[in-house]
Regions:
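Active-site neighborhood of HAD-like aspartate-dependent phosphohydrolases
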Residues: 2-57
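Glycine-rich phosphate-binding loop signature in dinucleotide/nucleotide-binding domains
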Residues: 7-9, 95-97, 148-154
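Short, acidic loop-to-helix structural element flanking the phosphoryl-transfer center
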Residues: 10, 72-101, 138
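Short glycine/proline-centered loop/turn elements that form peptide/ligand docking sites
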Residues: 22, 86-87, 137-141, 161-168
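Metal-dependent phosphoesterase signature
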Residues: 51-87
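Substrate-recognition "cap/lid" segment bordering the active-site pocket of phosphatases
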Residues: 102-156, 164
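Acidic, Mg2+-coordinating phosphoryl-transfer loop and its flanking beta/alpha structural elements
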Residues: 154-179
Length: 179
């Protein structure tokens, strides 16, 4: 990350992961468990033993109603921004490159807001579930490029997980920067 100008040579589009890339998520999982344990009734935990927890989560919209809002709040309360990545974003913006967020999770606008990042700086905000799958999905990565009208050979994916973000980039023939 130290030589960000060379990283952007020949690049016209930068596709960034959000969680763990734009902020340091160290300790977030533990804080999430502590914050959310109360929201899963014993009945739901019992259903886990019988394979019904996922059905309960979906039927009650727990993920959208409880999990994601809690995650957004905790990110705002204690996850520092990765200033080196934001410097790369600023340099890409200064150069007039296309910028996109391609996340494995929802609530993208809300997360950007609590991090003090303007969603308007990005040409596309999209999550893999909105595209019908999870990373690394070649079809999802291709759809991101299609929506941006971007060529793989001039696109740089930036992320914190090679097995997800890097695989997505390689699947479509794009460059990848692991932070």
């Amino acid at each position: 990350m130290s030589d960000k100008k060379n990283v952007l040579n020949g690049v016209q589009t930068v596709v960034l992961d959000l969680d763990g890339t734009l902020y340091d998520k160290t300790g977030l999982s533990r804080r999430m468990v502590r914050a959310l344990w109360w929201s899963l009734p014993l009945m739901a935990i019992d259903r886990l033993a019988h394979g019904g927890l996922w059905r309960w989560i979906v039927s009650t919209r727990w993920h959208q109603r409880v999990y994601l809002p809690t995650m957004v709040r905790l990110i705002g309360e204690g996850c520092p921004r990765r200033e080196n990545v934001l410097a790369l974003v600023a340099e890409a913006k200064r150069k007039g490159l296309q910028l996109a967020i391609y996340s494995d999770y929802g609530s993208i606008r809300e997360k950007l807001a609590v991090l003090g990042i303007d969603a308007k700086d990005f040409d596309l905000l999209i999550s893999a579930p909105e595209l019908g799958d999870l990373k690394p999905s070649k079809a999802c990565a291709e759809e991101v490029l299609r929506r941006l009208k971007a060529k793989p050979e001039t696109t740089l994916f930036v992320g914190d997980r090679d097995e997800k973000d890097g695989e997505s980039a390689r699947a479509v023939g794009a460059k990848f920067l692991l932070i």
